[in-house]
Amino acid sequence: NLRKKTELIEQMSAADITFISDSTTLAKGITATLKAKVDADLKNNKYTLSENLLSVNAVKARLNGWVQLAGDDINTDITLDCSGNNFKDILSLVPAFYTKDFANLTASGDVSLTAWVRGRMTKTAYPAFALDLKVANGSFKYADLPKSVTDIALRASVRNAGGSLDATTVEIPRFGASFGGQTFSATASVATPMSDLAFKASANGKINLGAIKEIYPLDKDMSLNGIITADVSAAGRMSQIEKQ
């Protein structure tokens, strides 16, 4: 007979993970590992995370909380402690940065990343979840390129009160950066992503495409030219675009 309580030691890893939704690649090339000690209450099917470390590319997080099996459902209350990560770690989550040139990238800035999942998952409903990311005074530079990107600021959040994934909202009330004497800022928000995506976005600034090669390592056969000047805003639903 199994003891009512025991300790489990888990170690899992996966490489080159790709996330695809409706034929759209959301992320690729992700490497993830999890090392964890789990206190298992076998009588109540409750598993509490104790010592653990989750790594996703260069980002490291500690998981606090528990998971409980309830028939076909799963109850959960988990928070992610992401303290200790720096701006370069966060950039590793962006496929365009997490390449062979990542080792040549230096970055600095103030970063805050928090996330949690709480509630019951069933065959038809999801628990509530949230993620908040803040970046201030950010900058990055590749060692073999002449210029850097500075004054990076970002506030972003993902929210869902539980139930349907269609209740998920994404808010980016602030994004800004400067490079080559130019500044660019933008905002965005997304709602009802599963049924009829509703969006609102704005952008302001000037981007010299010819200067991109001075801040980012382009492929040898890629050449960018031209100047983009933006002072625009847009709002609508995906169904409206599909009708055009």
Identify what each model region corresponds to.
Residues N1-T48, V59-E171, Q182-Q244:
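Membrane-proximal interfacial segments on either side of biological membranes
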